[in-house]
Amino acid sequence: MILPDISRFIKKNITFRDESLFAQDLDINKFKLRTEIENRHVLVIGGAGTIGSSFITALVDYNPSSLVVVDTNENGLTELTRRLRSDGKIKLPKTYLTYPMSFASETFNKILDRYNFDIIANFAAHKHVRSEKDITSIEAMIDNNVFSAHALLEKLSSNPPKHFFCVSTDKAANPVNVMGVSKKLMENLIMSYSAEFKITTARFANVAFSNGSLLDGHINRLMQRQPISCPSDVKRFFVSPEESGQICLLACILGNSGDIFFPKLGEDQLVNFKDITENFFDFLGIQIEYCNSEKEAKGISIKNMKTGDFNKYPVNFFESDTSGEKLYEEFYEENDIVNLKSYRELGVITNSYKPKKEEIQADIFKLKQVFQNKFSDKSSIVAALSSIVKGFKHIETGKSLDQKM
């Protein structure tokens, strides 16, 4: 059986564009991109995920000399290699190496010592709001998004690449969840090094059908014949997987140190998850059976499994009520200086706060003290984060996405 063309669905029902949003910016800057990438040595951290692998797909068009990819997901690296090797339009450099490891490991540091990378892009990040369910999950997230990123920057400062990129998120603008504020801290961290070597980042929209996303979950639930659950009141900006890699490549190569890139998307381009879900079922030719609760949806699913009748598929639409959930999206804050003229479809925040490294070290010490206190809980770390990042207004409902299907 040939599976449906998800990329076609994305173009027709989510982004509503047949051509990449960044096609013109790529074309206008193609000579600059080729000059900076061709015959260069590249390291991609977290390259097995959707955004990292899309960055690689965009990058190899410009003929780098070597490509090293690091990710903790060994199976993901295997699939990345299979996909790249199986694509007749992709030409990998002769030196193409993948290593399943953490970028916080000593073995990884040996890779940095062994190779002289011209371009380094870091996509290793906790990206889910659900990662703030308790202090243990929050510590793991901040360890990855902040502490390990700090150690990497310290290591690179003695032998910096020409271009360093570290991915961020739209949720870093006026953050209301711990994931967003952890990325805001990461932005402050990289800005504190931006005078020493060239560092850029990008905030962008949801990546449609990215690994682990709600929409990707729809496919997994369908494959398992399990019911689907979807918020009815949440709207998001979306880019395609292809576009997610392209915005990161443009930011990495073309940006000035300290720049934060974001896509030019207007309020009229926000898309409701409920609309996407209904359109997806229509695209698949499956009728939805609307359910008022998860319990009802699971009961219908069990019945369907027994009868083998899946002509109507159980879907529970619900109003969002979990901690840290933002019902709208924004890419920049009120006092940001934004350049909307340099690129066709990209905006750039040019005046980001650049703290001193000593301030960042003090913030990290403060957070580690909270984590080391055995009596600390989620509220303790939220309070510490609120004192460090001004404007952080955490939305706490006492409910986590891990409590939902």
Place the predicted regions along the sequence by residue.
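N-terminal Rossmann NAD(P)H-binding glycine-rich loop of SDR-like oxidoreductase domains
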Residues: V42-Y62
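SDR active-site strand-loop-helix element
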Residues: I45, V70, I120-A124, F164-T169, ...
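NAD(P)H-binding glycine-rich loop region in Rossmannoid oxidoreductase-like domains
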Residues: A58-V69, R85, L92, M101-D143
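Helix N-cap at the beta1-alpha1 junction of Rossmann-like dinucleotide-binding domains, i.e.
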Residues: D71-G76
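Hydrophobic/aromatic anchor residues within beta-strands of the central parallel beta-sheet
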Residues: T98, M141, F164, I199-A202
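Conserved Rossmann-fold NAD(P)-dependent oxidoreductase catalytic core, especially the SDR/UDP-sugar
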Residues: N122, H126-S131, I135-D143, F147-K184, ...
